[in-house]
Amino acid sequence: QVASDEGTYTLTSEVWFDATIEQVFEVYKYWEYATKFSSAIVEARDLEPDEFGRAQFYIRNRGCVLFFCQSFERQGYVESESNVVLRAFANPETSDFYHCNESWQFSVQNGGTVVTYDLSMRPKFWIPPAIGPYLLKRKLKKNGGQAVDRIELIAQAIDHE
């Protein structure tokens, strides 16, 4: 579900993976995995912790919607509780967003893992207001489905015993 309100976009999704919670959490925990499951992410890496000891991340995305192509960066910090929740907060001084906050909630269900994703972002770049939400939703659905399959395969290959 994608919504917009005066330039701020929100998204909520829920996905079930045929993998353990430990395996799935590990895929999300390390930002380097992102380039393996999302074609929109062209660079991703974990950075050294900040002065408060918080894990840091950097991601560069590239995407096109119709004829409009954009490359954008996010850099910020992560808060996490192992196998329960990850929260990422982009720093507006080093990102192409006024704000971009994400959270992933992990739970065991039906012999697998459910991940509930919430995003709130206000980009510094232009998204066409009349059709932006529709195009963003379409793009996320298309790329998201492919990413889900890849995440599951990566998670299943992680050995957690």
Range-by-range predicted roles:
Residues 91-138, 142:
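Beta-strand/loop substructures that line and gate deep hydrophobic ligand-binding cavities in soluble
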